[in-house]
């Protein structure tokens, strides 16, 4: 319960270089020197001791770090460590899953789900958003999700065209 209270305070309080890292250290997160943690960063409440953050790293707004996953009442919970190396930059709105190591000097693009290890000094993330399909049936209350899906048409790009 105490860990949840500290996590909630760290989620909202200012001072990303001092107060937020200190609150997470009290919870059991291992945090190096000169680490910046933005507001609205969530670090796992059940196993904060499984998170290690190296010196000179930055974790941006609305990033979530999980060290456990719950798969339902018939399966055992999965718990793992998250190791964030030195000089790492994590962009906003990232999700970091258990059993992940982010190497020293890595940069994680905003909006990325990190589900496997990231090598050191690597820019890691999904490609820029782009067109996925042509919408012929709008996804509105007047149509079902099935109608929407059936109405999707492929978009052919020069890159995907045969013979190019």
Please place each PLM-identified region on the residue numbering.
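Blade-loop segments of beta-propeller domains
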Residues: 69-72
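C-terminal segments of enzyme domains that contribute to small-molecule binding surfaces
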Residues: 77-91, 95-96, 127-164
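Left-handed beta-helix
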Residues: 33, 38-39, 44, 54-55, ...
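Short, small/polar residue-rich loop motifs at catalytic or cofactor-binding pockets
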Residues: 24-25, 46, 77, 95
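Short loop/turn motifs at secondary-structure junctions and domain boundaries
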Residues: 21, 42-45, 74
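Extended, small-residue-rich solenoid/repeat segments and analogous flexible loops
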Residues: 1-40
């Amino acid at each position: 319960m105490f860990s949840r209270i500290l996590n909630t305070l760290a989620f909202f309080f200012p001072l990303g270089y001092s107060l937020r890292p200190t609150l997470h250290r009290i919870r059991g997160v291992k945090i190096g020197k000169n680490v910046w943690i933005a507001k609205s960063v969530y670090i796992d409440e059940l196993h904060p001791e499984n998170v290690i953050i190296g010196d000179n790293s930055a974790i941006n707004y609305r990033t979530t770090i999980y060290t456990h996953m719950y798969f339902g009442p018939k399966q055992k919970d999965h718990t793992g460590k998250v190791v964030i190396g030195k000089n790492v930059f994590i962009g906003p709105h990232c999700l970091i899953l258990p059993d992940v190591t982010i190497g020293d000097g890595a940069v994680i693009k905003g909006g990325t789900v990190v589900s496997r290890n990231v090598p050191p000094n690597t820019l890691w993330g999904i490609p820029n958003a782009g067109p996925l399909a042509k919408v012929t049936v709008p996804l509105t209350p007047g149509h079902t999700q099935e109608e929407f899906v059936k109405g999707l048409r492929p978009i052919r790009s020069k890159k995907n065209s045969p013979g190019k």
